[in-house]
Amino acid sequence: MRYPLLIIFSIFCFVEAMAQNGQQQWAEPQLQAEWGLERMPHNNANPHVLVYKDKCYDALFTRSLGWNGGDGVQTTLLPGGHVFWSFNDSFYGRATDASSRIRRSSNFPRNSLMVQTPGEDGQPGAEDTNFVWLADWVQREDSTAEGYYHCRTHLRHPNGEKTEAQIRQGEIDQTWLYWAGDATVVDGCLQMLWAGVYNGTQNLMQPRNRAIAVYSLEGKPGSPEYLKLLSVDHNFIVHDPIGYGCTLWEDEDGHTYLYACYQFRKNAGDLLNTSSPVVARSRTHDLRSPWEYYVADASGKFHWQNTYPTPEEARRSAISSKSVATPWVFKDGDWYYMTAQGFVFAREVYIMRSRTPWGPFEDCRHLWSMPRELDKLGTRTYQHFYMPHLHQSLSRQGELVFSTNTDCKEWADNFNAVGSADFYRPYFFRVYNWKALFEE
């Protein structure tokens, strides 16, 4: 009888040891009070995965003068510990203070840039003085005059309909515009992709060209040389309906991988589109080198090709079976991971993995979920949650850092009401112990 008891006791000891090891491996992170992290309990079914609201970064982007809202919100780490931020549609002007957060007179540049300087600890600085806005101000001298702390669009589309005189007065192109893609540092310069958009009479926001802009990194943030626009190739891709390069991954194999999601009706009777992640790559890390597209042939066999995919090729070239949006790829250990939002406008953000940066990305797990309400005054519910962008340059301890975009039900709700200045601006979240999802 003692041998079965010995076996049972040994199994018990083994299970107990494994449990203790798991508790040690997935211990709660050592947080500092100044980080302003607020736990969101029960956000993930795995008890080791810990999701936090980042109230420090929320406060940094709760702004009342100049930039006071915007979407897009992507970052790129620059030399010297600086962080480059890009925004799409933004509000510039004035909002009231924390007691009411009412957005007042603001204009609406279609893209905008900012640089975050490092703090004394070398991490991205968490003071307002660490934000250097690369804004072309309309005027900042007379608070009673039109255009006070308004801003012009950073990069105009060459087909923009406004005259130079109208632009100087602070008017904004609305028919042809650029939205920001991802960016990377190559040979001491910043290379950035821009998505040309045609906003016709029905506000359809149709994709058009893909441009590449090159910026200087000479000097320091705030100096005339730093992030000076050196060149723009507006016709790098004359027509880019898929939108490759919304996000990038610079791999050790010498290529930069360019991700997008291709949306299409998978079946004739479908009410909603499918959104399939797809990938291209530049031949070298220089984004101006020739691009290759990862495409499946009619038999399902993938290959790299030099020609831009046809709609039929794109439909069969998904690098994940999941229908998602805003794919971000990074590498940790021997695995490549992709984070992405469930399609369409789902509150859930997923993570999946692959052995290569071109996929397939499977083994999909729920990572975190956007709260149903925002931490703001006035109306707290939002209409859409979209573009949860990953910010590796903001991570302190290997956690995953996300910004979110949320809009309000009616355009007028962005103005003149309590809390209106806290729609259409980023909120930030951090996910710790995320790798525990793949040890279940």
Q: What are the functions of these language-model segments?
A:
Residues 21-66, 77-176, 185-238, 252-324, ...:
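Beta-rich carbohydrate-recognition and catalytic domains
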Residues 69-71, 177-180, 242-244, 323-325, ...:
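Beta-rich catalytic cores
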Residues 1-23:
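Bacterial Sec-dependent N-terminal signal peptides
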Residues 13-15, 71, 275, 350, ...:
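Generic detector of short, well-ordered, non-transmembrane alpha-helical segments enriched
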Residues 75, 183, 246-248, 327-329, ...:
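Hydrophobic core register within WD40 beta-propeller blades
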